[in-house]
């Protein structure tokens, strides 16, 4: 069988969600080709070649762009079988012929081969939570079928750039934050990726030039003993390789005994979903932390020389102007201006189907109709001025970043827009904070500009993307985001 696997957006990383199923399919004798629309142009000849095509949709942005691409396939090859797989697979139900979520690899192989349904599926047959990833002997992810690492996001540190690899040591999450897409599929469960499989994939990426590894688990400390073991072994084998990971505030504090070893093993920064400084909002989201906990987590990581890169979701149905101001003051007071990509000051809660927030009693008064084109429910703030402020800040950040302004300069512009005095930091004040050239998001709804450009010519190198989602392709996320993974 000639199988075409397509990725549309994976945060600027070389798509693991193509490499793993490609390896499994190839090991079973199938002819597999991959296309990553983050960096590759659309190729109708590949569509003509394929016997079936499957789209990887690990997040909302990827799903929305996949809808555009599927429409192209339907025009060219109406009869071609199409699958959508990944965390957001179910969002393509009715658009793709087969949709799969959760632990998708075995189910995708079964679909390609037309075999019977597998054990581990839910009643819908969509969500699969088998434990294949923990089994030894799986083939190495087929990264040879993907564009080289140097075409993807890089680490910026000390005025230089380093090539970045990407792995996942676990899937799912033990927590059920209401705004996160992960519990919709995993429902508080995690699936461990076999230890040696993770290390072997790291090794092949180091051989390909990676000098930094991103652990893309929804929360790297969900299986803390497993993660420590992986980090320890990676550092023993590759002592010069650095890394970053995503960790929930609650876990930063609970597992504070790991940070000394992580720092000594090359941990440069931790992504953590702070979301809001309003404790009532954090409670509604079931985040499991408070603003005071966030401050403590910054101090814990800093004590070990590890930077924190917070993600924020300032605009929810409960947001007030005072909340926005308090968030900006928190960033300033804790010396985090250079650690926050300015787009995070503009992010608005996204509510896809299945969101655990939909049945929250305090959401009902703000919830509007489902928008099929956006793939999410519309909602409104009680004060229309808050919705207007979000749009104004989004336009401001877009314009400033497009003009090449530095992070401190953009931050001061945002502060001025909400009536706060500028901090007056030097434009270079953020230069010594390690970051990736791709802004970190979980799930973002792309702008109309992105979707139009993706439909016309979906090609843009992630390495050249800006801090915010205003490039004319799928290489960067937009300002409208589902909350980050539980971190």
Model-identified regions with their sequence ranges:
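Radical SAM enzyme core and accessory elements
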Residues: 2-6, 26-27, 31-34, 46-55, ...
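Flexible glycine/acidic-rich beta-alpha junction loops that bind and position SAM and/or redox cofactors
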Residues: 88-92, 175, 224-225, 280-285, ...
């Amino acid at each position: 069988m000639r199988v075409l696997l397509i990725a549309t957006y994976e945060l600027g990383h070389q798509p693991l969600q193509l490499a793993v199923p490609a390896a499994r399919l190839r090991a079973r004798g199938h002819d597999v080709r991959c296309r990553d629309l983050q960096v590759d142009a659309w190729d109708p000849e590949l569509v003509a070649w394929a016997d079936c095509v499957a789209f990887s949709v690990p997040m909302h942005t990827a799903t929305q762009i996949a809808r555009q691409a599927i429409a192209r396939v339907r025009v060219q090859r109406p009869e071609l079988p199409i699958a959508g797989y990944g965390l957001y697979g179910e969002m393509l139900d009715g658009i793709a012929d087969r949709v799969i979520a959760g632990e998708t690899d075995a189910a995708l192989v079964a679909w390609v081969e037309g075999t019977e349904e597998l054990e581990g599926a839910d009643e819908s047959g969509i969500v699969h939570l088998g434990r294949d990833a923990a089994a030894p002997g799986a083939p190495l992810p087929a990264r040879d079928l993907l564009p080289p690492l140097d075409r993807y996001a890089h680490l910026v540190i000390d005025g230089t750039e380093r090539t970045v690899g990407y792995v996942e040591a676990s899937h799912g999450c033990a927590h059920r934050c209401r705004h996160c897409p992960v519990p919709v599929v995993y429902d508080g469960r995690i699936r461990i990726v076999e230890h040696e499989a993770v290390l072997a994939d790291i090794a092949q990426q180091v051989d390909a030039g990676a000098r930094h590894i991103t652990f893309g688990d929804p929360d790297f400390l969900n299986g803390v003993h497993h993660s420590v073991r992986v980090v320890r072994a990676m550092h023993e084998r590759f002592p010069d390789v650095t890394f970053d990971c995503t960790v929930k505030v609650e876990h930063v504090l609970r597992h504070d005994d790991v940070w000394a070893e992580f720092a000594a093993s090359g941990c440069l920064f931790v992504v953590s979903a702070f979301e809001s400084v309003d404790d009532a909002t954090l409670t509604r989201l079931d985040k499991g932390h408070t603003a005071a906990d966030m401050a403590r987590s910054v101090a814990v990581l800093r004590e070990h020389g590890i930077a924190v890169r917070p993600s924020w979701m300032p605009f929810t149905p409960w947001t007030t102007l005072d909340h926005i101001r308090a968030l900006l003051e928190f960033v300033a007071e804790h010396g985090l201006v250079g650690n926050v990509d300015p787009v995070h000051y503009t992010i608005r809660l996204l509510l896809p189907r299945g969101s655990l927030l939909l049945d929250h009693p305090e959401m009902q008064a703000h919830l509007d109709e489902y928008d099929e084109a956006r793939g999410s429910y519309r909602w409104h703030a009680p004060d229309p001025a808050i919705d207007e402020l979000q749009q104004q800040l989004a336009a401001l950040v877009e314009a400033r970043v497009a003009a090449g302004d530095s992070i401190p300069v953009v931050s001061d512009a945002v502060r001025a827009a909400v009536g706060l005095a500028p901090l007056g930091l030097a434009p270079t004040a953020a230069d010594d904070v390690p970051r990736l050239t791709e802004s970190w998001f979980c799930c973002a709804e792309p702008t109309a500009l992105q979707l139009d450009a993706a439909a016309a010519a979906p090609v843009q190198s992630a390495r050249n993307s800006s801090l915010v989602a205003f490039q004319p392709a799928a290489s960067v996320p937009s300002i409208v985001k589902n909350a980050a993974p539980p971190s």
